[in-house]
Design a protein with these regions (language model features):
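Helix-loop-helix connectors at the membrane interface of multi-pass transporters/channels
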Residues: 1-8, 12, 167-185, 209-232, ...
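Flexible loop linkers connecting adjacent transmembrane helices
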Residues: 2-4, 37-43, 70-89, 114-137, ...
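Helix-loop-helix module between adjacent transmembrane segments
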Residues: 5-15, 19-29, 62-66, 101-105, ...
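Terminal cytosolic tails of multi-pass membrane transporters
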Residues: 1-8, 70-80, 349, 361-397, ...
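Membrane-embedded translocation segments of transport machinery
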Residues: 194-340, 347, 352-405
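Membrane-water interface regions at transmembrane-helix termini and the short interhelical loops
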Residues: 1-6, 31-46, 65-86, 134-141, ...
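N-terminal alpha-helical transmembrane segments of multi-pass membrane transport
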Residues: 1-130
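Amphipathic, interaction-prone secondary-structure segments
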Residues: 549-603
Length: 656
């Protein structure tokens, strides 16, 4: 017996992505000094010539996400109309909460506010006003803009995968623009750019992570801080991630994620308790207010009248980093958000992770600034000497330093492993055309490649090379994401138009497609509580017969129609060339018998308190009404009524 194929992927995407990534690896490995020079030139060019584009793109993503949530499109579900959320609101919030954590906040939680305080982009450093502006800038870089980028990509992936039935890959978001060409080279190129962005974005995080692990081990065990040690750490931790991938330890990774959440919450609560608690509670409120009050002006600030290098090393680096991470984080939040409305999705994704990040930066950043201003510790000197060491020198000033530094080091390692494992999974799904059940070796390949890219970038210039990799890889993805916004808006506008022009068919009382129904039949249908056996008989003798007649007639008129039949579901489809197909499903569903109908029980049932419904679904999901009890002519009338609405919708699309 032949087993599954050894290679389960989209060959153009897999091979194209691998070739480009290894071309970069070969270039950096063979000429590290030249590579460092090229990276520096690329970063300078992007900052000088394309900084405005990054700023405009990220502003667009935030306005677009908020606009969708506030518009009538916000009511549309990420899935069929009758889909229920896969996770409870509490569990969903918890997963979004965990998405807001990562290697980045460990690396920059102390360092970024201190660096902005000592060397602000404008004005004098080392002052109370500089401290206030430092927290504003940190919130700006890690707040709503970052999560708007993720929300746009996640929303597009969720909508087109769960509501339109397209592959769970970035190419699907361009379907409204290029149609089925997403399955050809235009779609392959989109997915290749998504893979490159994810690869270099995750590699940037891994590089930052090993720099900080090295700093922690130096503090705890005296291990020297060198590139050699950091490359060895990349290899070691990437190996751990590879083992988890090869072993299929989904439960283990889930437990690691839960451990991440527990340790991160412990650290932030500890700092709030051990630090200046009342000041921190006041600061989180004031920081949030200051951030929100200046968000518009800050969004569009490019320091055009007084150019400096600050924006390239900070704001543009972050925008490129977040954009390069968008397929990774976007796919995660898409997969956990099926059944949510667009409004729920945007509000949750923007506010929950941002809220946790604000708490983290206030706890670590404001406490570090308080130490500096009070003279309790020289945090500026520590950070300027070695950014990666900042967290550990900060924790050294608080009680139980050895314990908290050990916990912080463990947390960075677990973040590293889960990021690498999840990143390799996302890249594998994209290169496999949306298939989540591809071969294990493919996922192992991407896990090892991530570690290799991180190590090579460290050898090519450390933090500067990592920053350049993030900024450069984000540019093509930013262009794609703008097209994604347009494609998603086009699809949602059609969706609203469909909802306007295709009103839900009413149940029996409406007359079913203009066919009069005697009142006694209406009453009988309303009170009827059929068994499963009778429901299946109805599907076989009435629904199937009715739809077979319509299929025959439709085909006789030269249209392409199809019918799919089993005992509990019948699906009728009419194709319209390049226009949207019409689909009419009738499915049996068991429901709890209403209390008033208990006395009507008759016959054998699968449960003493269950009855059955024959519910209608269209392309956009369940319509919420039951046709069990209709005659054959009434079923045909209902189908034609829905088809008439669909044709009207297609007409409205053609005419504008």
């Amino acid at each position: 017996m032949n087993g599954p194929p050894l290679f389960q992927a989209s060959k153009p995407v897999f091979l194209g992505s691998a070739a480009l990534i290894f071309a970069v690896i070969f270039f950096v490995a063979s000429s590290p000094s030249l590579a460092a020079s090229v990276f520096s030139g690329v970063q300078s060019f992007i900052v000088r010539e394309l900084g405005w584009f990054y700023v405009a793109a990220v502003a667009t993503f935030l306005v677009f996400a908020v606009g969708l949530a506030l518009s009538s499109m916000g009511r549309i579900k990420l899935g069929p109309d009758d889909a229920e959320p896969d996770f409870s609101t509490h569990s969903w919030f918890a997963m979004l909460f965990s998405a807001g954590m990562g290697i980045g906040i460990m690396f920059y939680g102390v360092a970024e506010p201190v660096l902005h305080f000592s060397s602000p982009p404008a004005g004098d450093g080392g002052t109370i006003d500089a401290a206030r502006r430092a927290m504003q800038l940190s919130f700006f870089h890690w707040g709503l803009h970052a999560w708007a980028i993720y929300a746009v990509m996640g929303l597009a992936l969720a909508y087109f995968a769960f509501r339109q039935g397209l592959p769970l890959t970035p190419r699907s978001a361009l379907h409204p623009l290029i149609g089925d060409r997403i399955y050809g080279w235009p779609g392959h190129l989109v997915d290749i750019f998504a893979v490159l962005g994810t690869m270099f974005g995750v590699a940037t995080s891994l590089g930052l992570g090993v720099m900080q692990i090295n700093a922690g081990l130096n503090y705890l065990l005296g291990i020297p801080v060198t590139i050699t040690v950091q490359v060895a750490l990349v290899a070691g931790v990437a190996l751990l991630a590879t083992i988890s991938v090869a072993s299929g330890l989904n439960r283990g990774i889930r437990r690691l994620s839960e451990l991440n959440l527990t340790l991160a919450v412990f650290l932030v609560v500890f700092v709030f308790a051990a630090g200046p608690t009342v000041f921190l509670l006041q600061a989180v409120m004031q920081n949030t207010g200051a951030y929100l009050s200046e968000i518009v002006g800050r969004t569009f600030t490019l320091y055009a009248y007084r150019p400096n290098d600050w924006i390239g090393g900070w704001t543009l680096f972050y925008w490129g980093w977040w954009i390069s991470w968008s397929p990774f984080v976007g796919m995660f939040i898409a997969r956990i958000s099926r059944g949510r409305t667009i409004r729920e999705f945007v509000v949750g994704v923007l506010l929950v992770p941002s809220g946790f990040t604000f708490l983290w930066f206030t706890a670590f950043g404001n406490t570090a600034l308080s130490m500096e201003l009070s003279g309790a510790a020289s945090m500026v000197a520590a950070v300027e000497a070695n950014v990666a060491v900042a967290l550990f020198q900060f924790l050294e000033q608080l009680p139980f330093a050895v314990i908290t530094m050990t916990i912080a080091t463990i947390l960075i390692v677990t973040f590293f492993v889960t990021s690498s494992d999840s990143g390799s999974l996302v890249i594998d799904i994209i290169t496999a055309g949306g298939n989540i059940e591809s071969r294990v070796w493919q996922r192992v390949f991407w896990a090892l490649t991530q570690g290799l890219v991180a190590a090579i970038l460290l050898l090519a210039g450390g933090l500067a090379a990592l920053q350049t990799g993030a900024i450069a890889s984000g540019f093509p993805l930013a262009v794609i994401m703008l097209l994604v916004c347009y494609g998603l808006f086009t699809a949602l506008r059609q969706e609203v138009q469909r909802q306007t022009n295709m009103q839900v068919a009413m149940p029996v009382a409406s007359g079913m497609g203009h066919l009069p129904v005697p009142w006694r039949q209406r009453l009988s249908a309303m009170l009827h509580q059929p068994t499963r056996e009778r429901a299946v008989t109805f599907m076989r003798t009435v629904v199937r017969s009715a739809l077979e007649e319509v299929v025959t007639e439709i085909r006789a008129r030269g249209l392409d129609a199809a019918l799919s039949i089993d005992d509990e579901k019948v699906t009728f489809t009419i194709l319209h060339g390049n226009e949207e197909e019409f689909r009419y499903d009738v499915s049996l569903r068991g429901v709890v018998l209403p209390a008033f109908a208990m006395a009507m029980l008759e016959g054998e049932r699968e449960g003493p308190e269950r009855t059955w419904r024959a519910e209608v679904s269209l392309h956009e999901g369940g319509q919420g009404y039951d046709i069990l009890g209709y005659t054959k002519e009434q079923v045909i009338a209902d189908l034609l009524g829905q088809y008439e609405r669909h044709l009207n919708f297609l007409h409205m699309q053609r005419t504008g």
